[in-house]
């Protein structure tokens, strides 16, 4: 299965498809909300 390259927006339903990690700017507490609204991007493995 192909993974999503760095810089691809990742959401709750596909955040595990990033080649690296799904990175969100405002830390873990806001993460589910940020993933829902599309504020997270695939980036290097954390």
Swiss-Prot record:
**Which first-to-last residue range defines the signal peptide?**
none
List its uses: Could be considered as a biological insecticide candidate, when fused to Galanthus nivalis agglutinin (GNA), a protein with the potential to cross the insect gut. This chimeric Sf1a/GNA variant shows a gain in toxicity against insects when administered orally, while maintaining similar effects as the wild-type toxin when injected. This variant has been found to be orally toxic against larvae of the tomato moth (Laconobia oleracea), the rice brown planthopper (Nilaparvata lugens), and the peach-potato aphid (Myzus persicae).
Keyword Metal-binding present in the record's keywords: the answer is no
Which Pfam families does the record associate with it?
Toxin_28
Q: Which domain of life is it from?
A: Eukaryota
- Membrane-spanning intervals of the chain: none
Listed as disulfide-bonded, the cysteine pairs are 3-19, 10-22, 18-42, 24-40
InterPro entries (alphabetical): Insecticidal_knottin-like_sf, Toxin_28
Question: Function, please?
Answer: Insecticidal toxin. It inhibits insect voltage-gated sodium channels (Nav) by partially blocking the channel pore (1 uM inhibits 55.7% sodium current in DUM neurons from the American cockroach), not by acting as a gating modifier. The inhibition is only partially reversible (about 25% recovery) after prolonged washout. In vivo, the toxin causes flaccid paralysis followed by death when injected into Heliothis virescens larvae. It also causes uncoordinated movements followed by full paralysis to sheep blowflies (Lucilia cuprina).
Miscellaneous note, as given in the UniProt record, is:
Negative results: does not show significant effects on voltage-gated calcium channel (Cav) and voltage-gated potassium channel (Kv) currents in cockroach DUM neurons. In vivo, does not induce any toxic effects when injected intravenously into adult mice at a dose of 1.5 mg/kg body weight. Exists in two forms, due to cis-trans isomerization at 31-Arg-Pro-32.
Q: What is known of its domains?
A: The presence of a 'disulfide through disulfide knot' structurally defines this protein as a knottin.
Under which name does UniProt file this protein? Mu-segestritoxin-Sf1a
